[in-house]
UniProtKB/Swiss-Prot annotation:
The chain crosses the membrane at residues 36-56, 65-85, 140-160, 178-198, 274-294, 303-323, 380-400. Residues 57-64, 161-177, 295-302, 401-409 are extracellular. Belongs to the insect chemoreceptor superfamily. Heteromeric odorant receptor channel (TC 1.A.69) family. Or1a subfamily. One of its GO terms (molecular function) is ligand-gated monoatomic cation channel activity. Odorant receptor which mediates acceptance or avoidance behavior, depending on its substrates. The odorant receptor repertoire encodes a large collection of odor stimuli that vary widely in identity, intensity, and duration. Forms a complex with Orco to form odorant-sensing units, providing sensitive and prolonged odorant signaling and calcium permeability. Involved in the behavioral responses to esters. Involved in the behavioral responses to butanol, pentanol, hexanol, octanol, propyl acetate, and butyl acetate. Expressed in ac3B olfactory sensory neurons in the antenna. This is Odorant receptor 35a. One of its GO terms (cellular component) is plasma membrane. Glycans are attached at N161. The gene is Or35a. It is a multi-pass membrane protein. Keywords: Cell membrane, Glycoprotein, Membrane, Olfaction, Receptor, Sensory transduction, Transducer, Transmembrane, Transmembrane helix. The atypical heteromeric and topological design of the odorant receptors appears to be an insect-specific solution for odor recognition, making the OR/Orco complex an attractive target for the development of highly selective insect repellents to disrupt olfactory-mediated host-seeking behaviors of insect disease vectors. Odor-evoked OR currents are independent of known G-protein-coupled second messenger pathways.
Length: 409
Protein backbone atom coordinates (compact mmCIF):
# COMPACT_ATOMS: atom_id res chain seq x y z
CA UNK A 1 0.00 0.00 0.00
CA UNK A 2 1.92 3.01 -1.33
CA UNK A 3 0.76 6.62 -1.10
CA UNK A 4 0.88 8.69 -4.27
CA UNK A 5 4.39 9.91 -5.16
CA UNK A 6 4.42 13.33 -6.93
CA UNK A 7 6.46 13.38 -10.14
CA UNK A 8 7.43 15.90 -12.79
CA UNK A 9 6.40 15.37 -16.41
CA UNK A 10 9.72 13.55 -17.08
CA UNK A 11 9.06 11.06 -14.27
CA UNK A 12 11.52 12.57 -11.79
CA UNK A 13 10.26 12.59 -8.19
CA UNK A 14 9.30 15.96 -6.70
CA UNK A 15 11.14 16.81 -3.49
CA UNK A 16 8.34 17.70 -1.07
CA UNK A 17 8.72 20.25 1.73
CA UNK A 18 8.61 18.63 5.18
CA UNK A 19 4.94 19.51 5.96
CA UNK A 20 3.80 17.82 2.74
CA UNK A 21 6.19 14.90 3.27
CA UNK A 22 4.49 14.32 6.65
CA UNK A 23 1.02 14.95 5.19
CA UNK A 24 1.71 12.34 2.50
CA UNK A 25 1.70 9.68 5.25
CA UNK A 26 -1.89 10.58 6.22
CA UNK A 27 -3.95 7.60 5.07
CA UNK A 28 -7.20 9.59 4.96
CA UNK A 29 -6.24 12.79 3.16
CA UNK A 30 -3.50 11.67 0.72
CA UNK A 31 -4.45 9.39 -2.19
CA UNK A 32 -2.95 6.03 -3.05
CA UNK A 33 -0.39 5.57 -5.80
CA UNK A 34 -1.88 4.16 -9.04
CA UNK A 35 0.53 1.21 -8.74
CA UNK A 36 -1.16 0.03 -5.51
CA UNK A 37 -2.62 -3.46 -5.91
CA UNK A 38 -6.08 -4.78 -5.15
CA UNK A 39 -5.30 -5.92 -1.59
CA UNK A 40 -3.53 -2.64 -0.80
CA UNK A 41 -6.61 -0.69 -1.88
CA UNK A 42 -8.83 -3.01 0.16
CA UNK A 43 -6.67 -2.48 3.26
CA UNK A 44 -6.77 1.29 2.71
CA UNK A 45 -10.59 1.20 2.60
CA UNK A 46 -10.68 -0.86 5.80
CA UNK A 47 -8.47 1.72 7.54
CA UNK A 48 -10.67 4.55 6.25
CA UNK A 49 -13.81 2.85 7.59
CA UNK A 50 -12.09 2.17 10.93
CA UNK A 51 -11.00 5.82 11.14
CA UNK A 52 -14.56 6.98 10.37
CA UNK A 53 -15.92 4.77 13.17
CA UNK A 54 -13.32 6.12 15.60
CA UNK A 55 -14.27 9.67 14.58
CA UNK A 56 -17.92 8.87 15.35
CA UNK A 57 -17.00 7.37 18.72
CA UNK A 58 -14.95 10.46 19.65
CA UNK A 59 -17.75 12.72 18.43
CA UNK A 60 -20.21 11.00 20.75
CA UNK A 61 -17.87 11.05 23.77
CA UNK A 62 -16.85 14.70 23.33
CA UNK A 63 -20.44 15.79 22.72
CA UNK A 64 -21.50 14.05 25.95
CA UNK A 65 -18.85 16.06 27.79
CA UNK A 66 -20.07 19.33 26.25
CA UNK A 67 -23.69 18.56 27.09
CA UNK A 68 -22.74 17.68 30.67
CA UNK A 69 -20.82 20.92 31.21
CA UNK A 70 -23.53 22.97 29.48
CA UNK A 71 -26.15 21.53 31.83
CA UNK A 72 -23.91 22.53 34.78
CA UNK A 73 -23.52 26.05 33.29
CA UNK A 74 -19.74 25.72 33.54
CA UNK A 75 -18.61 27.97 30.69
CA UNK A 76 -14.88 27.51 31.25
CA UNK A 77 -15.07 23.70 31.28
CA UNK A 78 -17.46 23.77 28.31
CA UNK A 79 -14.99 25.81 26.24
CA UNK A 80 -12.15 23.48 27.26
CA UNK A 81 -13.74 20.75 25.14
CA UNK A 82 -15.11 23.00 22.40
CA UNK A 83 -11.93 23.49 20.26
CA UNK A 84 -11.15 19.78 19.95
CA UNK A 85 -14.81 19.00 19.24
CA UNK A 86 -15.07 21.66 16.51
CA UNK A 87 -11.89 20.49 14.79
CA UNK A 88 -13.11 16.88 15.07
CA UNK A 89 -16.41 17.70 13.34
CA UNK A 90 -14.56 19.73 10.71
CA UNK A 91 -12.23 16.78 10.10
CA UNK A 92 -15.22 14.44 9.73
CA UNK A 93 -16.77 16.60 7.02
CA UNK A 94 -13.48 17.16 5.20
CA UNK A 95 -12.47 13.49 5.37
CA UNK A 96 -15.87 12.40 4.04
CA UNK A 97 -15.50 14.73 1.06
CA UNK A 98 -11.93 13.51 0.44
CA UNK A 99 -12.92 9.83 0.57
CA UNK A 100 -15.73 10.41 -1.92
CA UNK A 101 -13.29 12.03 -4.39
CA UNK A 102 -10.10 10.05 -3.69
CA UNK A 103 -9.33 9.04 -7.29
CA UNK A 104 -10.13 12.52 -8.63
CA UNK A 105 -7.67 14.01 -6.12
CA UNK A 106 -4.89 11.69 -7.28
CA UNK A 107 -5.44 12.62 -10.94
CA UNK A 108 -5.65 16.29 -10.03
CA UNK A 109 -2.32 16.16 -8.17
CA UNK A 110 -0.78 14.29 -11.08
CA UNK A 111 -1.75 17.13 -13.45
CA UNK A 112 -0.49 19.73 -10.99
CA UNK A 113 2.97 18.27 -10.47
CA UNK A 114 3.42 17.43 -14.16
CA UNK A 115 2.17 20.69 -15.71
CA UNK A 116 1.78 23.49 -13.15
CA UNK A 117 4.39 22.93 -10.44
CA UNK A 118 7.42 25.09 -11.21
CA UNK A 119 10.43 22.87 -11.83
CA UNK A 120 13.44 24.21 -9.85
CA UNK A 121 15.76 22.63 -12.44
CA UNK A 122 14.32 24.77 -15.25
CA UNK A 123 13.18 27.90 -13.38
CA UNK A 124 15.36 28.14 -10.24
CA UNK A 125 14.77 31.88 -9.72
CA UNK A 126 10.98 31.68 -10.04
CA UNK A 127 10.93 28.56 -7.85
CA UNK A 128 12.83 30.38 -5.08
CA UNK A 129 10.39 33.29 -5.34
CA UNK A 130 7.36 31.00 -5.16
CA UNK A 131 8.80 28.75 -2.47
CA UNK A 132 9.63 31.80 -0.35
CA UNK A 133 5.91 32.51 -0.01
CA UNK A 134 5.49 29.15 1.74
CA UNK A 135 7.84 29.94 4.65
CA UNK A 136 5.04 31.31 6.85
CA UNK A 137 2.92 28.22 6.22
CA UNK A 138 5.81 25.99 7.26
CA UNK A 139 6.14 28.00 10.46
CA UNK A 140 2.42 27.40 11.05
CA UNK A 141 3.01 23.68 10.49
CA UNK A 142 5.69 23.73 13.19
CA UNK A 143 3.23 25.44 15.56
CA UNK A 144 0.60 22.78 14.86
CA UNK A 145 3.29 20.16 15.44
CA UNK A 146 3.97 21.73 18.84
CA UNK A 147 0.25 21.59 19.68
CA UNK A 148 -0.13 17.89 18.91
CA UNK A 149 3.17 17.10 20.65
CA UNK A 150 1.88 18.72 23.83
CA UNK A 151 -1.33 16.69 23.55
CA UNK A 152 0.59 13.46 22.96
CA UNK A 153 2.83 14.04 25.98
CA UNK A 154 -0.29 13.72 28.16
CA UNK A 155 -0.31 9.86 28.16
CA UNK A 156 3.25 9.87 29.55
CA UNK A 157 2.22 12.08 32.47
CA UNK A 158 -0.92 10.00 32.85
CA UNK A 159 1.18 6.87 33.36
CA UNK A 160 3.60 8.66 35.72
CA UNK A 161 0.76 10.05 37.84
CA UNK A 162 -1.16 6.76 37.64
CA UNK A 163 -4.25 8.62 36.44
CA UNK A 164 -6.52 7.60 33.60
CA UNK A 165 -6.98 10.82 31.66
CA UNK A 166 -7.75 10.95 27.96
CA UNK A 167 -6.10 13.42 25.60
CA UNK A 168 -9.38 15.25 25.03
CA UNK A 169 -12.37 16.15 27.20
CA UNK A 170 -14.59 13.08 26.85
CA UNK A 171 -17.34 11.17 28.67
CA UNK A 172 -18.02 7.63 27.48
CA UNK A 173 -21.42 5.92 27.95
CA UNK A 174 -19.64 3.01 29.65
CA UNK A 175 -17.00 2.46 32.31
CA UNK A 176 -13.65 3.31 30.69
CA UNK A 177 -11.51 2.75 33.81
CA UNK A 178 -10.53 -0.93 33.26
CA UNK A 179 -7.07 -1.01 31.71
CA UNK A 180 -8.11 -3.27 28.81
CA UNK A 181 -10.66 -0.60 27.80
CA UNK A 182 -8.68 2.52 28.71
CA UNK A 183 -5.52 1.66 26.75
CA UNK A 184 -7.25 1.00 23.37
CA UNK A 185 -9.31 4.20 23.81
CA UNK A 186 -6.16 6.17 24.60
CA UNK A 187 -4.47 4.75 21.48
CA UNK A 188 -7.45 5.86 19.38
CA UNK A 189 -6.98 9.33 20.93
CA UNK A 190 -3.41 9.34 19.63
CA UNK A 191 -4.50 8.06 16.19
CA UNK A 192 -7.18 10.75 15.88
CA UNK A 193 -4.75 13.44 17.05
CA UNK A 194 -2.09 12.54 14.48
CA UNK A 195 -4.57 12.26 11.59
CA UNK A 196 -6.32 15.55 12.40
CA UNK A 197 -3.14 17.50 13.15
CA UNK A 198 -1.50 16.46 9.88
CA UNK A 199 -4.77 17.37 8.16
CA UNK A 200 -4.79 20.85 9.73
CA UNK A 201 -1.35 21.87 8.52
CA UNK A 202 -0.92 19.47 5.60
CA UNK A 203 -4.00 20.25 3.55
CA UNK A 204 -3.56 24.00 4.03
CA UNK A 205 0.06 23.67 2.91
CA UNK A 206 -1.04 21.72 -0.15
CA UNK A 207 -3.72 24.28 -1.02
CA UNK A 208 -1.23 27.13 -0.61
CA UNK A 209 1.30 25.30 -2.78
CA UNK A 210 -1.31 24.76 -5.48
CA UNK A 211 -2.18 28.46 -5.47
CA UNK A 212 1.37 29.87 -5.36
CA UNK A 213 2.59 27.61 -8.17
CA UNK A 214 -0.45 28.47 -10.29
CA UNK A 215 0.30 32.13 -9.61
CA UNK A 216 3.95 31.55 -10.51
CA UNK A 217 2.92 29.90 -13.79
CA UNK A 218 0.88 32.99 -14.69
CA UNK A 219 3.91 35.15 -13.89
CA UNK A 220 6.10 32.99 -16.15
CA UNK A 221 3.50 33.35 -18.89
CA UNK A 222 3.71 37.13 -18.59
CA UNK A 223 7.52 37.12 -18.54
CA UNK A 224 7.83 34.87 -21.60
CA UNK A 225 5.35 36.99 -23.55
CA UNK A 226 7.24 40.20 -22.82
CA UNK A 227 10.60 38.67 -23.79
CA UNK A 228 9.20 37.32 -27.07
CA UNK A 229 7.64 40.70 -27.94
CA UNK A 230 11.00 42.41 -27.40
CA UNK A 231 12.57 40.02 -29.92
CA UNK A 232 9.89 40.84 -32.50
CA UNK A 233 10.46 44.58 -32.05
CA UNK A 234 14.24 44.22 -32.28
CA UNK A 235 14.05 42.07 -35.44
CA UNK A 236 11.53 44.51 -37.05
CA UNK A 237 10.53 42.21 -39.91
CA UNK A 238 7.90 44.72 -41.09
CA UNK A 239 5.83 42.54 -43.49
CA UNK A 240 5.49 39.80 -40.84
CA UNK A 241 5.48 41.68 -37.51
CA UNK A 242 1.69 41.62 -37.06
CA UNK A 243 1.53 37.93 -37.91
CA UNK A 244 4.42 37.13 -35.56
CA UNK A 245 2.68 38.90 -32.68
CA UNK A 246 -0.61 37.20 -33.56
CA UNK A 247 1.04 33.76 -33.49
CA UNK A 248 2.75 34.63 -30.20
CA UNK A 249 -0.49 35.81 -28.56
CA UNK A 250 -2.32 32.71 -29.85
CA UNK A 251 0.35 30.47 -28.30
CA UNK A 252 0.19 32.45 -25.05
CA UNK A 253 -3.61 32.25 -25.00
CA UNK A 254 -3.48 28.45 -25.27
CA UNK A 255 -1.24 28.32 -22.19
CA UNK A 256 -3.47 30.91 -20.53
CA UNK A 257 -6.57 28.78 -21.16
CA UNK A 258 -4.78 25.68 -19.79
CA UNK A 259 -3.93 27.58 -16.59
CA UNK A 260 -7.50 28.88 -16.33
CA UNK A 261 -8.82 25.34 -16.72
CA UNK A 262 -6.51 24.13 -13.96
CA UNK A 263 -7.82 26.96 -11.79
CA UNK A 264 -11.36 25.69 -12.36
CA UNK A 265 -10.24 22.16 -11.44
CA UNK A 266 -8.65 23.58 -8.27
CA UNK A 267 -11.92 25.32 -7.46
CA UNK A 268 -13.94 22.13 -8.05
CA UNK A 269 -11.57 20.06 -5.91
CA UNK A 270 -11.35 22.41 -2.93
CA UNK A 271 -14.49 24.57 -2.88
CA UNK A 272 -16.35 22.31 -0.41
CA UNK A 273 -13.37 21.84 1.90
CA UNK A 274 -12.54 25.57 1.84
CA UNK A 275 -16.15 26.29 2.82
CA UNK A 276 -15.94 23.83 5.72
CA UNK A 277 -12.58 25.25 6.85
CA UNK A 278 -13.76 28.87 6.80
CA UNK A 279 -17.18 28.05 8.29
CA UNK A 280 -15.60 26.48 11.39
CA UNK A 281 -12.75 29.00 11.70
CA UNK A 282 -14.60 31.80 13.52
CA UNK A 283 -16.06 29.53 16.21
CA UNK A 284 -12.75 27.73 16.69
CA UNK A 285 -10.79 30.99 17.03
CA UNK A 286 -13.37 32.31 19.47
CA UNK A 287 -13.08 29.28 21.77
CA UNK A 288 -9.28 29.23 21.55
CA UNK A 289 -8.92 32.95 22.28
CA UNK A 290 -11.26 32.70 25.27
CA UNK A 291 -9.30 29.84 26.83
CA UNK A 292 -5.98 31.58 26.16
CA UNK A 293 -7.31 34.83 27.63
CA UNK A 294 -8.83 33.43 30.83
CA UNK A 295 -5.69 31.56 31.95
CA UNK A 296 -2.75 32.04 29.56
CA UNK A 297 -0.20 30.15 31.67
CA UNK A 298 -2.32 27.02 32.14
CA UNK A 299 -3.81 27.14 28.63
CA UNK A 300 -0.65 27.80 26.60
CA UNK A 301 -1.64 25.01 24.16
CA UNK A 302 -4.72 27.02 23.21
CA UNK A 303 -2.59 30.16 22.77
CA UNK A 304 -0.23 28.36 20.37
CA UNK A 305 -3.17 26.84 18.51
CA UNK A 306 -4.87 30.26 18.26
CA UNK A 307 -1.68 31.81 16.89
CA UNK A 308 -1.24 29.03 14.33
CA UNK A 309 -4.85 29.27 13.12
CA UNK A 310 -4.71 33.06 12.86
CA UNK A 311 -1.47 33.11 10.88
CA UNK A 312 -2.76 30.24 8.70
CA UNK A 313 -5.91 32.18 7.75
CA UNK A 314 -4.02 35.39 7.00
CA UNK A 315 -1.30 33.61 5.02
CA UNK A 316 -3.81 31.61 2.96
CA UNK A 317 -5.85 34.77 2.40
CA UNK A 318 -2.80 36.73 1.23
CA UNK A 319 -1.81 33.96 -1.19
CA UNK A 320 -5.37 33.90 -2.57
CA UNK A 321 -5.31 37.69 -2.99
CA UNK A 322 -1.96 37.47 -4.82
CA UNK A 323 -3.47 35.03 -7.32
CA UNK A 324 -6.50 37.29 -7.82
CA UNK A 325 -4.19 40.28 -8.43
CA UNK A 326 -2.12 38.36 -10.98
CA UNK A 327 -5.15 37.07 -12.91
CA UNK A 328 -6.73 40.52 -12.78
CA UNK A 329 -3.64 41.95 -14.51
CA UNK A 330 -3.79 39.47 -17.42
CA UNK A 331 -6.09 41.70 -19.48
CA UNK A 332 -3.57 44.54 -19.04
CA UNK A 333 -0.79 42.14 -20.06
CA UNK A 334 -2.43 41.58 -23.44
CA UNK A 335 -3.15 45.28 -23.87
CA UNK A 336 0.51 46.14 -23.20
CA UNK A 337 1.87 43.96 -25.99
CA UNK A 338 3.19 47.01 -27.89
CA UNK A 339 0.59 46.41 -30.57
CA UNK A 340 0.62 50.14 -31.43
CA UNK A 341 4.29 49.92 -32.42
CA UNK A 342 3.64 46.72 -34.33
CA UNK A 343 0.82 48.37 -36.30
CA UNK A 344 3.02 51.40 -36.95
CA UNK A 345 5.77 49.29 -38.50
CA UNK A 346 3.63 46.55 -40.08
CA UNK A 347 2.93 46.65 -43.81
CA UNK A 348 0.22 43.96 -43.79
CA UNK A 349 -3.25 45.57 -43.22
CA UNK A 350 -5.19 42.27 -43.14
CA UNK A 351 -2.90 40.82 -40.44
CA UNK A 352 -3.18 44.09 -38.52
CA UNK A 353 -6.96 43.68 -38.37
CA UNK A 354 -6.71 40.04 -37.25
CA UNK A 355 -4.21 41.06 -34.58
CA UNK A 356 -6.55 43.70 -33.15
CA UNK A 357 -9.46 41.24 -33.03
CA UNK A 358 -7.27 38.68 -31.24
CA UNK A 359 -6.10 41.23 -28.66
CA UNK A 360 -9.72 42.23 -27.97
CA UNK A 361 -10.61 38.55 -27.50
CA UNK A 362 -7.65 38.00 -25.13
CA UNK A 363 -8.61 41.03 -23.03
CA UNK A 364 -12.25 39.92 -22.85
CA UNK A 365 -11.27 36.36 -21.83
CA UNK A 366 -9.27 37.68 -18.88
CA UNK A 367 -11.57 40.47 -17.74
CA UNK A 368 -12.27 38.94 -14.31
CA UNK A 369 -9.82 37.94 -11.55
CA UNK A 370 -9.81 34.33 -10.36
CA UNK A 371 -10.52 33.47 -6.74
CA UNK A 372 -10.60 30.08 -5.06
CA UNK A 373 -13.92 30.10 -3.21
CA UNK A 374 -15.84 28.14 -0.62
CA UNK A 375 -19.02 27.19 -2.49
CA UNK A 376 -19.02 30.75 -3.97
CA UNK A 377 -19.78 32.01 -0.45
CA UNK A 378 -16.25 32.60 0.86
CA UNK A 379 -13.35 33.88 -1.22
CA UNK A 380 -9.84 32.81 -0.32
CA UNK A 381 -8.55 36.34 0.19
CA UNK A 382 -6.94 38.48 2.86
CA UNK A 383 -10.21 40.37 3.27
CA UNK A 384 -12.07 37.11 4.02
CA UNK A 385 -9.44 36.15 6.61
CA UNK A 386 -9.78 39.52 8.33
CA UNK A 387 -13.58 39.22 8.38
CA UNK A 388 -13.32 35.81 10.07
CA UNK A 389 -10.99 37.27 12.70
CA UNK A 390 -13.42 40.14 13.22
CA UNK A 391 -16.32 37.70 13.67
CA UNK A 392 -14.33 35.59 16.15
CA UNK A 393 -13.51 38.73 18.16
CA UNK A 394 -17.23 39.58 18.33
CA UNK A 395 -18.01 36.08 19.66
CA UNK A 396 -15.09 36.41 22.09
CA UNK A 397 -16.46 39.65 23.60
CA UNK A 398 -19.85 37.96 23.95
CA UNK A 399 -18.32 35.03 25.85
CA UNK A 400 -16.29 37.26 28.16
CA UNK A 401 -19.44 39.23 29.01
CA UNK A 402 -21.23 35.94 29.78
CA UNK A 403 -18.36 34.89 32.05
CA UNK A 404 -18.49 38.18 33.95
CA UNK A 405 -22.22 37.77 34.42
CA UNK A 406 -21.73 34.23 35.79
CA UNK A 407 -19.03 35.43 38.19
CA UNK A 408 -21.19 38.30 39.43
CA UNK A 409 -24.05 35.89 40.11
Amino acid sequence: MVRYVPRFADGQKVKLAWPLAVFRLNHIFWPLDPSTGKWGRYLDKVLAVAMSLVFMQHNDAELRYLRFEASNRNLDAFLTGMPTYLILVEAQFRSLHILLHFEKLQKFLEIFYANIYIDPRKEPEMFRKVDGKMIINRLVSAMYGAVISLYLIAPVFSIINQSKDFLYSMIFPFDSDPLYIFVPLLLTNVWVGIVIDTMMFGETNLLCELIVHLNGSYMLLKRDLQLAIEKILVARDRPHMAKQLKVLITKTLRKNVALNQFGQQLEAQYTVRVFIMFAFAAGLLCALSFKAYTNPMANYIYAIWFGAKTVELLSLGQIGSDLAFTTDSLSTMYYLTHWEQILQYSTNPSENLRLLKLINLAIEMNSKPFYVTGLKYFRVSLQAGLKILQASFSYFTFLTSMQRRQMSN
